Amino acid sequence: MTKTKGKVVGINGNMISVSFEGLVTLNEVGYVEVGSKKLKSEVIRIRGEVAQLQVFEITKGIKVGDIVEFTGDLLSVELGPGLLGQVYDGLQNPLPELAEQAGYFLERGIYLNALSRTAKWHFTPSAKEGDTLKRADLLGTVPEGSFTHRIMIPFNMYGTYKLKSIKPEGDYTVDDTIAEVTDERGNVIPLTMSFKWPVKRAIDCYAERLKPTETLVTKMRTMDTFFPVAKGGTYCIPGPFGAGKTVLQHATSRNADVDIVIIAACGERAGEVVETLTEFPELKDPKTGRTLMERTIIICNTSSMPVAAREASVYTGVTLAEYYRQMGLDVLLLADSTSRWAQALREMSGRLEEIPGEEAFPAYLESYIAAFYERAGIVRLSDGSKGSVTIGGTVSPAGGNFEEPVTQATLKVVGAFHGLSRERSDARKYPAIHPLDSWSKYPSVLPLEQVKYGRSFLRRGTEVEQMMKVVGEEGTSIEDFIIYLKGDLLDAVYLQQNSFDKVDDAVSVERQQHIYNILIEILGTSFKFVSKDEARSYFSKLKLMFIDYNYSPWGSDAFKSHEDGIKKHIAEKADSLDERAKKLLKQAV
């Protein structure tokens, strides 16, 4: 089949208009010839015989009359063994190899294979000759790090196939033919270990989509207890600049109870990506004891790279996540930041001269954001195993204004909202998730009634604090002042975590439940205080005791002695325990 060719008839920034004769489809890849180089671009609109393409490189040097060659392929990623531990740009070019070939500053027009053509993988066949197979069925497996990588029938092969031949166990490259299948018409199709899949099409080779109910344990107390995320769920982290969005995502990627983490750094500062690249190879995965980099894929399209590739980087990340979900693995995709992706959409929409929506974002922004988050989910595969993709996206609203279109469109589709507050980050309260503005629709690691009880003290404590700002401490009753101190204690010792401390950085569910029960006892106890000063000094001492308690390894002698000290300190001034707290503690036992 001859490839369609066209000519450039107009240039507007990184968008070019091309007149063509023949067949061109939306999202098809085209290459613009500039001298000896070919620049990759994607068809974003077709009107009659003129197509608009967004170029993924700087368009300097392109002129009217330049030749554009359409490939006939949609914008796709290559799927196969060897993805884990890689660092890609938004178009799935491996950056370490690019640096070797082109130096530290990216040259345009250089595109490399996403998977190594020389690395050999030990293939073990599972299917037998004569088997009837359909897309996503298992041909065999190869070990990839600590995972078993499934080699499957390509997802774009619809219909049924008969396995004609399959290679015996041995070492092969991703280009070697490992099997041959016959289609319903008798055509023989050779299969390798890798294949391509369009990034903007969701992978749907599963038997059933399930409701996310199992909590994704992040080992962050505030997230697991108060604002949980489910495996296969979605959540967003909006917050002003410098409030700790990226740091929170890094902590989640280190400690979350998932098999694979994919970080899509979309339009963020390069320094943050560099931090991940230097940190992850040195960090140990608590499950396997190997480096975190072995279970991580990083797609970085930093703010210094072309804007057009930002949109592609988000879709590349979610497609790789769906691919590993097909192997029955739990995948966490962290998109940082979806605001930059939305800005890339806005820029393209402006160039296409579409009618703008609010704040000049395209009118279809909501449906684009919804379509992206809908690709998350927990699924049951045809062999009965389960896999999940959990998506966490940060939003960077200008000035921390949560009323802007990207935040509002995201809030409509996500299952949990972790709103970061400038006030909390300035007060060095980490993580800076606002305990009253944030919410979650997913089940917590603790019983719902216990969580509600704790939140009621946070809310009432904040109300008393606001009242004290107006009438002063003198105009507040001692009962209200104690409620304020209890809310402040819960915030300081449970919601806040020290990520620089080895013990406090990652807190197991058992430890969270244990500490929370002690806090329920404190919250439900009425204390005998003569004055507010006595109450303040009592709770200050309790706070310091709890911080030492949090830094003691679970089950150690120091942990037990700190706990005994806390219980003794509570008994000194305790009067009685309210009925609701008694009931909650009985349930916990």
Swiss-Prot record:
Q: What class of enzyme is it?
A: translocase
What the entry lists under CDD domains is as follows: ATP-synt_F1_V1_A1_AB_FliI_N (cd01426), V_A-ATPase_A (cd01134)
According to its UniProt entry, the protein's GO biological process terms are: proton motive force-driven plasma membrane ATP synthesis
* Catalysed reactions, as listed in the record: ATP + H2O + 4 H(+)(in) = ADP + phosphate + 5 H(+)(out)
Where is ATP annotated to bind? G239, P240, F241, G242, A243, G244, K245, T246
Q: What is its EC number?
A: 7.1.2.2
Q: GO MF terms on file? A: ATP binding; proton-transporting ATP synthase activity, rotational mechanism; proton-transporting ATPase activity, rotational mechanism
Gene3D superfamilies in UniProt: 2.40.30.20, 2.40.50.100, Bovine Mitochondrial F1-atpase, Atp Synthase Beta Chain, Chain D, domain 3, P-loop containing nucleotide triphosphate hydrolases
Source organism, top-level taxon = Bacteria
**What are the alphabetically sorted keywords of the record?**
ATP synthesis, ATP-binding, Hydrogen ion transport, Ion transport, Nucleotide-binding, Translocase, Transport
Please explain the role this protein plays, according to its UniProt record: Produces ATP from ADP in the presence of a proton gradient across the membrane. The V-type alpha chain is a catalytic subunit.
Give the record's family classification: Belongs to the ATPase alpha/beta chains family.
Listed name of the protein = V-type ATP synthase alpha chain
Q: Which organism is it from?
A: Treponema denticola (strain ATCC 35405 / DSM 14222 / CIP 103919 / JCM 8153 / KCTC 15104)
